[in-house]
Amino acid sequence: SYIHDIQNWIQLEIAERLKANPGTYFDNYPQLLRNSFHPENFYMTPEGIVIYYQQYDIAPYSSGIPEFLLPFDANVSES
C-alpha cells in the first residue's frame, strides 16, 4: 500500500539523519513511526508533500516536530 511505501521511505530518511545527528530519534523509531503514522498529518509545499509527526511521537521533545519532505518527483515505492 502507499502508506507502507511512505513509512519505509521515512524510515530510510531517519536512518540518514541519524548518521549526521545520532540520538535525535528514539531507538525504536521504526516501530513508533508506524504506530504513530496518521495519513492526515501532512501539508503541501511547492516542492512536495511534508509529512509530520507530533512532538515525542518518534523523537525526544527537544527534536521538535519531525517533518519529512516527500518531493513530488520521488518514487517511494522503489525505496
Segments predicted by a language model, with ranges:
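Compositionally biased intrinsically disordered regions enriched in Thr/Gly
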Residues: 1-79
